[in-house]
Amino acid sequence: GTGSFGHTVLKHFLTTDIGEIRIFSRDEKKQDDMRHELQAKYPEYAAKVKFYIGDVRNIQSLRDVMPGVHFIFHAAALKQVPSCEFFPMEAVRTNVEGTDNLLHAAMEAGVERVVCLSTDKAAYPINAMGISKAMMEHVITANARVSAQRGGPVICCTRYGNVMCSRGSVIPLFVDQIKNGEPITITDPDMTRFLMNLDEA
């Protein structure tokens, strides 16, 4: 809940009649920063946001946060392409196994709906990140089928492309390269890259 997507979704939901919003992430520093930002910018809504430290790799930490939850946006992922190339099993543990853990915990807790975030890189994947996200989608589909048969949560998945200025986006990288007079690192000059802003995502 502390990444680019989590920040944006939180701003959309903060002023609604939702009674409680739970932010679940493994990054205590980002949680603390988010808490301070809420208290400074939205003091009247800050009390309805609760923070939980945990990791999708640890199913018990997911089970601990689930009671009373109705809807989940699952955005936890390793998404840096180079990191996933160098450490592919870490991508599997978070993106594939972590998603499976989350969905099992959600089904056990009787959550109503789970929306999982994937990437356009899962279509015809050519790198470890895309492959791990494609496998994640298969895990989502399999769990959605089981959940539907059991009358459990509605589980769905959405793919989105490159989000401008999100963590790991190429835009800040390109800006820095231009400022420093460095060549822009484009893999293929004929490549097309689809970009959207955070609100569109």
Region annotations inferred by a language model:
Residues 25, 52-53, 93, 188:
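Conserved residues in the N-terminal Rossmann fold of short-chain dehydrogenase/reductase
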Residues 71-74, 78-137, 142:
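Conserved Rossmann-fold NAD(P)-dependent oxidoreductase catalytic core, especially the SDR/UDP-sugar
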Residues 128-129, 134-200:
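NAD(P)-dependent short-chain dehydrogenase/reductase
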Residues 1-16:
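N-terminal Rossmann NAD(P)H-binding glycine-rich loop of SDR-like oxidoreductase domains
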